[in-house]
Amino acid sequence: MGIIKPFRIKSFKHKNPSIEFKDVSIAFGNRPVLDKVNFKINQKTIHGLLGPNGAGKSTMYHLITGLLEPKHGKILIDNEDVTKLPVYLRTRKYGISFVPQYGGTFSDLTLIDNLKAISEIVVKNKDLRLERINYLISKLELENIKNIKAKNLSGGERKKLTIALS
């Protein structure tokens, strides 16, 4: 497998968005996970998020991608409050997505149907959609398994699919 050249959907206006949390809090039941968290990740920088199990790392990723909403505070991307912005709009506008550790696929759909389903949300132009799908299938070496249901893929094949879906 070779290196995959990154590409951006042409509609992305923000190629390197900044991400900021302002007084973000979230709890699961009575258990606070994040309490008035403040930070900013500037454009064109790389950061790692480290901490023990249960520290809130995955929760922060879910908040950034829109899979969770904070109980309090704001999440800004390029100084725009995206706290209430749906997941698909964050992906379409900013190119922000999340590759889950487990799951992340439609288990009863084939690999190619998984890619088609997600690309219809993100890429409006049908020709561009098919071009991107074919590119990903080729680069991730998925050609021989594109018609197999996700639930029947190996763990590594499923991980490749979740990377393609992100």
Regions found by a protein language model. Name each.
Residues 127-145:
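Conserved ABC ATPase "signature" region
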Residues 149-153:
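Conserved ABC ATPase signature
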Residues 81-97, 102, 126-130, 147:
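ABC ATPase NBD coupling module
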Residues 19-21, 34:
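Conserved structural motif at the start of ABC-family nucleotide-binding domains
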Residues 29, 47, 85, 113-128, ...:
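ABC-type ATPase nucleotide-binding domains, specifically the catalytic core motifs of the NBD
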Residues 73-81, 92-94, 137:
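Conserved ABC transporter NBD signature motif
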